[in-house]
């Protein structure tokens, strides 16, 4: 797997201001699969997992991000689901900048990996693609 050494996070698409001022939909639209894979490849998979120590629910962040980088979004969801039953909510409202992303090694000199954005993507992908009885 090739690493993406881009110093900045993949930008999150947002609604056009002229559209969003007429609705109550989310402003941030979320990543596409290609964007999520590209952002996940920014993770350098640190041996001591500082991002995981910053996660209050203990998600195995390097493992779920590794699955996203490989395009295995369902496996990523299963990793998150072991520790959190609300990944779509946490991916949107958890203060990642002071928790997991705040501990990300990439964030020392550049922008940290977009862990919350990836968690949101995985949860949304699961909701849209996995049909349970």
Model-derived regions: residue spans:
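Ferredoxin-type iron-sulfur electron-transfer modules and their immediate structural context
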Residues: 1-133
